[in-house]
């Protein structure tokens, strides 16, 4: 995850 993005 990175801030509001969870790929």
UniProtKB/Swiss-Prot annotation:
Disulfide bonds join 1-6. It is found in: Secreted. It comes from the Eukaryota. Expressed by the venom duct. The keyword Transferase does not apply. GO terms for cellular component: extracellular region. One of its GO terms (molecular function) is toxin activity. Keywords: Disulfide bond, G-protein coupled receptor impairing toxin, Secreted, Toxin. Its main location: secreted. The cysteine framework is C-C. Cyclic peptide that displays a 100-fold selectivity for type-1 angiotensin II receptor AT1 (AGTR1) over AT2. Interacts at high nanomolar range affinity. Binds to the extracellular side of the receptors. Shows a competitive antagonism mode of action on AT1, blocking G-alpha (q), G-alpha (i3), G-alpha (oA), beta-arrestin 2 pathways and ERK1/2 activation. Negative results: does not have effect on endothelin type A (EDNRA), endothelin type B (EDNRB), apelin (APLNR), vasopressin type 1a (AVPR1A) and vasopressin type 2 (AVPR2) receptors. This is A-conotoxin cyclic Mila. It comes from Conus miliaris.
